[in-house]
């Protein structure tokens, strides 16, 4: 059975999708961009600031479903410029230092609202 996850602590969806969907013990978190959930404005002028906001948004959806970052088993990262890869990794590694999840990182030509990064994750309860 599918359970829809929603929290005011993450940005409202900007299209016909859910912030998260839980099926059994697996949680699928939709792509998060660096939008402040209180103002609905893009935050951060650089990849470091935007990465922090994105991961904080992901944490909010995870926590709304009773999960934590340690439960993330896979992440998909979309960067507007692959030259930001190293700087992105420096921030990402602070959140996923203990048993980091599997990950795919790709460069894309454009992201919603012209942000620098979008991340989606899959989490599973142990």
From Swiss-Prot:
CDD domains: YjgF_YER057c_UK114_family. It comes from the Archaea. Disulfide bonds: none annotated. PROSITE patterns: UPF0076. Gene3D superfamilies: RutC-like. GO terms for molecular function: deaminase activity. GO terms for cellular component: cytosol. InterPro entries: RidA (IPR006056), RidA_CS (IPR019897), RutC-like_sf (IPR035959), YjgF/YER057c/UK114 (IPR006175). Belongs to the RutC family. This is RutC family protein SSO3206. It comes from Saccharolobus solfataricus (strain ATCC 35092 / DSM 1617 / JCM 11322 / P2).
């Amino acid at each position: 059975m599918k359970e829809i996850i929603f929290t005011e602590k993450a940005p409202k969806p900007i299209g016909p999708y859910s912030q998260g969907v839980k099926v059994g013990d697996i949680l699928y978190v939709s792509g998060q961009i660096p939008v402040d959930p209180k103002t609905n404005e893009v935050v951060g002028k650089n990849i470091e600031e935007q990465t922090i906001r994105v991961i904080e948004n992901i944490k909010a959806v995870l926590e709304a479903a009773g999960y934590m970052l340690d439960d993330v088993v896979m992440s998909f990262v979309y960067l507007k410029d692959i030259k930001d890869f190293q700087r992105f990794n420096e921030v990402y590694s602070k959140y996923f230092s203990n048993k980091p999840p599997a990950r795919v990182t790709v460069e894309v030509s454009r992201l919603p609202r012209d942000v620098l990064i979008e991340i989606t994750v899959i989490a599973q309860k142990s």
